[in-house]
Amino acid sequence: MLLVNRAITLNLVKRCCWRSTMFMTPKRFLGTSEEESTAALLLQKNLIQRNNMLYGHGSGTIRCTVFDAGGNIVSPALDIKREELVAKHGLLPRDLRKIEKSRKNDLVPSFLVRKNGILVSLATIKTLIKPDMVIVFDSFGSLNSTSHKAFLNSLKLRLQNLDMVELKKDPLPYEFRALESIFISALSNLTSEMNVQVTICKGILQDLEYSITRDKLKFLLGQNKKLSNFYKKTVLIRDMLDDLLEQSDVLCSMYLSDLKNGVEHKDDDHSEIEMLLETYHNHLDEIVQITENIISNVKTTEEIINIILDSNRNQLMLLGIRFSIGMLSLGGPIFIGSLYGMNLENFIEETDYGFIAASAIGMISLGALYFYSIKHLHKLQKMSLFNYTNYARDVKK
């Protein structure tokens, strides 16, 4: 993106300099290259600053909020260098890829357990959990959001772990309390989003029961796409928890406080973190089931609408066929009337009942053609699957 911006700025500077050279003296024209390079550098710096303000990251820094072991905010909105973060906390450079590129909500979650830390990327929440520190990475657009402020307040209360009248002390270690706060915030956001999506979809489906319009179908299509994206996001988070619950060594390595104090856990000694993950896995599974039911209702409604539209289309086709049958039936009496009305001598005109006979023959031919065609049309309408298989068998013979 910087290369594109640099090319645009150079083109703008060249145009400005080309226009200005039309009124320059020869001495002044000699200094245009220096002015052009200076203007290009200034514009490039301004564009870099503008991009940093828009996307919330610098060339080598990451903005974050740091909590200490007591749950207090040490430094809000602190810019930490990427190299310093990797070297100080024992991370790999690729571990920060999702955090650096998280300009929007990430669909794919990640849960990385390292030697002395846990790196979590869950929807809009991206944190690094250590046995005595929590680093919350502030993504673009989340600094002033209500959900981000609520998450920071909830995380602060759980990390402080004060013994109050309404809230007792939590026996879980520091890192598990941080994880629980992350899951609670993520689940509350997912639940709120699910309630909004479900309410909108139910309202559209109820409106479609009374009238089917183009605007409602278009709105239902857009809402179905949003619901599908939300369903994918919840399924990915649930699958991530499934993978974690199946890896006993990873669960044991999540006891950061015990590992710091020299206490190692065996493969089957991870009941606390397993119960914690299973609890939120069940909540996520409930959200997934509700979303699946709504998606199935939307698909069922779409199928019913398609059936209704096909039925209406068939009715229009039948109406056109009936008009065609009527026009075909009118051909019989018209033909007889044209013969009777020819300016030729015939015995019909000499009789007293010629006109009545011609009219009767025309009406009889009209009725015969009409009822014969309608009878065959009804046979085609009442054709069942059994009749179709017998017809296909007869054709093969």
Swiss-Prot record:
Biological process GO terms, please?
Answer: mitochondrial magnesium ion transmembrane transport
Location of motif YGMN in this chain is: 340-343
What Pfam families does this protein's entry cite?
MRS2-like
A Gene Ontology molecular function term of the record: magnesium ion transmembrane transporter activity
GO annotation, cellular component aspect: mitochondrial inner membrane
Membrane topology for this entry? Multi-pass membrane protein
**Annotated organelle transit peptide span:** 1-37
Q: Which Gene3D superfamilies match?
A: 2.40.128.330, Magnesium transport protein CorA, transmembrane region
Record-annotated membrane-spanning stretches: 316-336, 354-374
InterPro entries for this protein: MRS2-like
Alphabetical UniProt keywords: Ion transport, Magnesium, Membrane, Mitochondrion, Mitochondrion inner membrane, Transit peptide, Transmembrane, Transmembrane helix, Transport
Q: Where in the cell is it found?
A: Mitochondrion inner membrane
CDD domains registered for this protein in UniProt: Mrs2_Mfm1p-like (cd12823)
Q: What is its main location?
A: mitochondrion
Name the job this protein performs: Mitochondrial inner membrane magnesium transporter required for mitochondrial magnesium homeostasis. Modulates the conductance of the MRS2 channel. Involved in the splicing of mRNA group II introns in mitochondria by affecting mitochondrial magnesium concentrations, which are critical for group II intron splicing.
Subunit architecture: Forms homooligomers. Interacts with MRS2.
In the record, the note on similarity to other proteins reads:
Belongs to the CorA metal ion transporter (MIT) (TC 1.A.35) family.
Protein name listed in UniProt: Mitochondrial inner membrane magnesium transporter LPE10
* Natural source organism: Candida glabrata (strain ATCC 2001 / BCRC 20586 / JCM 3761 / NBRC 0622 / NRRL Y-65 / CBS 138) (Yeast)
